[in-house]
Amino acid sequence: SLPPDEKATSLPSMSLELLSVERKALRINLDSKMYGTFAEIGAGQEVARHFFQAGGAAGTVAKTMSAYDMKFSDKIYGEAGRYVSRKRLVQMMAHEFGLLQDRLSSDRGEVSQFFAFSNTVSALNFHKTNECHGWMGIRFQLEPLGEMHDIILHVRMLDRENRLQQEAIGMLGVNLVYGAFHLNENPDDFIQ
């Protein structure tokens, strides 16, 4: 467990504590209120991986998935025209958040802040000829039974190795989940 001085709270800008990606994932995992899904397409399941490696993920992760094949993706989320697009990301977040509410609201809705993290990424191909970018977002509640909030990012990846792109996506995703819950009242700190 975390020491008392590391309780999950919004921190004032002047005393913003710098935490490692692993520590941020662990903080989320140890908060019994936060519960959600990770749906990642195109650069592995790097964000979910951080939460599993941090420990305690059973209390946070309802489901992870990667609908890598385009036909599977269309069957799950509906057609979007382009697979790496804001439209596809919003479809993913809406579908996954809807499943959380449909399947778990009666059991956990009054005590859980649900979230659906999603990304769709065009990572570096084998020939290193493609534009590397993606969309990443989270749909989340700030309190149990609360309204939904969305944060959506467009990401350009400049690393010229696939492994480095995957690592960057993983770190950015953890920071997005952490920021959504712990820095939502401090936009400047969230962006840093």
Residue spans of the language-model regions?
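Short, positively charged and aromatic/hydrophobic N-terminal segments
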Residues: S1-P3, S10
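Non-catalytic terminal extensions that flank enzyme cores
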Residues: T9-Q192
